[in-house]
Design a protein with these regions (language model features):
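Conserved class I S-adenosyl-L-methionine
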Residues: 114-150
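A short glycine-rich, Lys/Arg-flanked "PGG" loop and its adjoining helix->strand segment in the class I
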Residues: 99-113
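Short conserved loop adjoining the S-adenosyl-L-methionine
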Residues: 74-79
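A conserved beta-strand element that flanks and buttresses the S-adenosyl-L-methionine
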Residues: 86
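Conserved N-terminal segment of class I S-adenosyl-L-methionine
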Residues: 1-73
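Short catalytic micro-motifs in class I SAM-dependent methyltransferases
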Residues: 89-90
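Short alpha-helix
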Residues: 162-186
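C-terminal lobe and adjacent flexible extensions of AdoMet/dcAdoMet transferase-like proteins
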Residues: 196-205, 210-241
Length: 241
């Protein structure tokens, strides 16, 4: 098992406030899942299985709790068999998202969904992601560029701007490239709690109890402030019937 996964697992076990935030993520994912087979890409430390025990968990790296080791750009899934593909913090690590979307479109049944929670680059979050978070933000990148995936590429290479670019600047182009897919939802959420937890770092500036209260307040603010200040976006992409 890769060393970063060990570090993430340790943080997950030691930080109840981290679990509070991710349970909010999982509540959002579960609320929009279609009935049927659900496949997780980027299963990582396996925490989604605690909420969705029947999910088929995959990752590009081996871990004993995973059901399958697979690259998101070359999925071993039969055509038209999957109801949901769910991912947390995965899209911005994929080398060629266009290849990924074609793979998932092939595997989804009509009405099936890709449900992704990702970093949101907004007026309120940009300084945090650019100056504090360790992963790059390249807004000038082409998130839908074509190419052949490199099997030797570091799976932790990333561009945190990719999900925001697909949801905004490249949305019309996405529709042209993938006429069988539609971006059905782009929910902009999460303001203070996520950065205050420190993520998978050993520190946190907020308690679990306070995090729960602030999360409730944040949900009330999402309709008015989400697009301006959110730190997260949930994209729901649906395969047309």
């Amino acid at each position: 098992m890769a060393e970063p996964l060990n570090e993430y697992l340790t943080a997950w076990d030691r930080k109840p406030v981290l679990r509070t935030v991710y349970n909010d993520f999982y509540d959002r994912i579960i609320s929009v899942c279609a009935p049927g087979l659900t496949v997780e890409i980027g299963g990582g430390i396996g925490n989604l299985k605690q909420r969705l025990p029947n999910v088929v968990a995959t990752d590009i790296q081996f871990a004993p709790w995973l059901d399958c080791v697979a690259d998101a750009q070359n999925l071993p899934l039969a055509d038209g068999t999957v109801s949901n593909v769910v991912m947390v913090d995965v899209l911005h690590h994929i080398e060629f998202p266009a290849v990924f979307f074609r793979q998932v479109s092939r595997a989804l049944r009509p009405g099936g969904r890709i449900i992704m929670i990702e970093p949101a680059i907004t007026w309120g979050s940009t300084l945090f992601y650019r100056l504090i978070h360790h992963e790059p933000v390249r807004m000038s990148a082409d998130p839908l560029v074509e190419g052949t995936p490199d099997p030797k590429r570091d799976p932790y290479d990333s561009n945190q701007a990719i999900p925001t670019l697909i949801a905004t600047r490249e949305r019309a182009r996405f529709a042209r490239m993938f006429p069988d897919l539609a971006i059905a939802q782009a929910d902009w959420f999460s303001f203070l709690v996520y950065p205050l937890t420190g993520g998978f770092k050993p520190w946190s500036l907020i308690s679990p109890g306070m995090a729960e209260r602030v999360l409730r307040l944040e949900r009330m603010l999402e309709p008015s402030l989400g697009r301006l200040a959110a730190f997260r976006v949930m994209l729901v992409v649906e395969k047309r019937a």
